[in-house]
C-alpha cells in the first residue's frame, strides 16, 4: 500500500516537473557545473562526459525555444550529472597520476638507498 502511494507521489512530482518551465537558475547551475569540470581538467581527462554535458545543455536550450519544458528540464539535469561525472573522473585520473609519480619516486629512492647502503634497506 505505502509503495503504491510512493509511486503515485513520484508520478505526480514528475508530472509537475513536466509542465513547469525550468528556472534560469537551473541553466546557470548546469553552466557552472561545466565550468567546474573544465577547471579540473575534464577537457583532457574526461572529454566524452564533458562533451555530453555541453550537448545536453545546448539541447535543453533548444527544448526551451520549442516550449518542450519537460525535455529541457531533464536535459539540464543530465547535463549536470555528466559534468559531475567529468569532475570525478578528472579527479580520479589526477590522483592516479600522482600515485604513479610518487610510486616511481619511492622506487628511485629505494634503489639509491640499496646502492649506497646495501641490502639492509630492502
Q: What residue ranges belong to the model's regions?
A:
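Bacterial signal peptide processing site
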Residues: 18-20
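Pro/Ala/Gly-rich low-complexity, hydrophilic intrinsically disordered segments
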Residues: 85, 89-122
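Post-signal-peptide N-terminal segment of Sec-exported extracytoplasmic proteins
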Residues: 25, 35-78, 119
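Short, low-complexity, disordered segments immediately C-terminal to signal peptides
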Residues: 22-31
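C-terminal motif of bacterial Sec signal peptides marking the signal peptidase cleavage site
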Residues: 14-16
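A structural signal for well-ordered alpha-helices, especially hydrophobic packing surfaces
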Residues: 34, 57, 61-64, 83, ...
Amino acid at each position: 500500500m505505502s509503495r503504491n502511494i510512493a509511486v503515485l507521489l513520484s508520478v505526480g512530482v514528475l508530472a509537475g516537473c513536466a509542465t513547469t518551465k525550468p528556472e534560469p537558475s537551473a541553466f546557470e547551475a548546469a553552466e557552472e557545473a561545466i565550468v567546474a569540470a573544465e577547471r579540473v581538467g575534464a577537457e583532457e581527462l574526461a572529454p566524452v562526459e564533458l562533451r555530453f554535458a555541453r550537448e545536453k545543455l545546448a539541447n535543453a536550450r533548444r527544448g526551451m525555444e520549442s516550449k518542450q519544458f519537460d525535455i529541457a528540464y531533464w536535459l539540464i539535469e543530465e547535463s549536470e550529472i555528466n559534468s559531475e561525472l567529468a569532475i570525478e573522473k578528472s579527479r580520479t585520473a589526477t590522483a592516479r597520476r600522482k600515485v604513479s609519480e610518487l610510486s616511481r619516486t619511492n622506487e628511485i629512492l629505494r634503489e639509491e638507498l640499496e646502492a649506497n647502503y646495501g641490502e639492509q634497506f630492502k
